[in-house]
Amino acid sequence: MADSKSFKEKQYAFAAHIRDPEHVAPPDGIESRRMAIYRGLFFNNLSSLLATFFPVLRKIHSDAQWRGFIRGFMQHHQAETPYFLQLPQEFLAYLQTEFDAADDDYPFLLELAHYEYAELELAVSDDENEIQGIDPNGDLLTGVPAMSSLARAFAYRYAVHRISPKFLPEEPEAQPV
């Protein structure tokens, strides 16, 4: 039992250091070179994974800004899932509830992150449309419209669907988008 507890404590110390190497010392007994490899692998893999899920958010930020987002996520957010496809939801939750925005952060940051998360969620959804009772050859003008199971209604203050490195609005739209 003591060995099991000791191993678990070492795992917690290892994970705590990986998440916040600037403030948490590495566990005893692990060579610093090896620890640096683990730190780099974890950080770079998470950064790359989240950049894939939030491509526009990544493109409009410098490397230093992006590293700050990832490091803050690692330090402050207790992710509840081991699944890669659920990490974007965790990252969005971090941005919405724990992220401390700086004065120079884009005013549309949260809306853009939500939009990109919604795109991903719809892209990987396995929801199927209920087509029972729908005539695929029916008259579109006299028939009753059928809503896709993937239809979502969102309203954003910024034109998040247009944001890119070449379009970075400073003011919200006159009407919700």
Q: Which residues are covered by each model-predicted region?
A:
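Charged, compositionally biased N-terminal leader segments and the immediate start
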Residues: 1-36
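Short alpha-helical scaffolding segments that buttress acidic/His motifs in well-ordered protein cores
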Residues: 14, 69-74, 91
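Glycine/small-residue-rich interface belts in oligomeric ring/scaffold proteins
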Residues: 29-72
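Short helix-capping/linker segments at secondary-structure and domain boundaries
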Residues: 21-25, 61-64, 99-101
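Hydrophobic packing positions characteristic
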Residues: 75-177
